[in-house]
């Protein structure tokens, strides 16, 4: 076994959703089980991803050989757990904003800077699609996510409590 693993980011083509999204959903489930608190992450369900993919979206992955070890999903849609648009909390134009829905990294591959690289790659792709802003959420106590988000230039807009979910809402301009 080689000690070197190619951690290049690749676009995930979704031609047959039930097959192509299965590794992403499986990875979400695996990652969710490794987190210290349930409220740190709420996996995106298949139906929700399909709905979000009706508009612009960016789905990226990193593979170790043929195994998906990290994934990132951003969509022109997306809402908070209360189903309100982010513009209820942040003063950005919704039609020029893309939601970075999730970044998930297999526990065995954490510490390689994948989350930050995904965030940077997603911003570049969103810019190519004509978007000017990105927004995302994280639990305030999920330190690795908060550090990656803030390290990628996102600014904290507000912290909200929605039912049992506490979320920091972040946003940033992605224009050059």
Walk through the language-model features, giving the residues of each.
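Conserved acyl-donor/pantetheine-binding loop and adjacent beta-alpha core of acyl/acetyltransferases
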Residues: 70-102, 110
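Conserved GNAT acetyl-CoA-binding A-motif
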Residues: 126-138
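Conserved acetyl-CoA-binding loop-helix of GNAT-fold acetyltransferases
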Residues: 102-105, 111-124, 151
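C-terminal "cap" of GNAT-fold acetyltransferases
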Residues: 161-176
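Active-site rim helix/loop that mediates acceptor-substrate recognition in acyltransferases
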Residues: 37-65, 73
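Conserved active-site alpha-helix within GNAT-family acetyltransferase domains
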Residues: 128, 140-158
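Conserved N-terminal entry element of GNAT/NAT acetyltransferase domains
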Residues: 1-26
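Conserved beta-strand-loop-alpha-helix junction that forms the acyl-donor binding cleft
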Residues: 110, 136-146, 162
């Amino acid at each position: 076994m080689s000690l070197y693993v190619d951690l290049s980011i690749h676009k995930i083509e979704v031609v047959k959703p039930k097959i192509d999204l299965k590794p992403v959903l499986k990875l979400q489930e695996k990652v969710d089980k490794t987190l210290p608190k349930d409220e740190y992450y709420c996996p995106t369900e298949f139906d929700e991803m399909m709905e979000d993919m009706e508009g612009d979206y960016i789905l990226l992955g990193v593979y170790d050989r043929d195994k998906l070890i990290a994934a990132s999903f951003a969509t022109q849609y997306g809402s908070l757990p209360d189903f309100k648009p982010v513009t209820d909390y942040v003063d950005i134009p919704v039609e020029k904003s893309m939601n970075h829905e999730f970044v998930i990294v297999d526990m065995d591959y954490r510490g390689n800077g994948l989350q930050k690289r995904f965030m940077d790659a997603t911003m570049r792709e969103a810019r190519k699609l004509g978007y000017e802003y990105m927004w995302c959420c994280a639990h305030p106590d999920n330190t690795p996510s908060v550090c990656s988000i803030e390290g990628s230039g996102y600014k904290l807009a507000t912290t909200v409590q929605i039912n049992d979910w506490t979320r920091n809402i972040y946003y940033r301009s992605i224009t050059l």
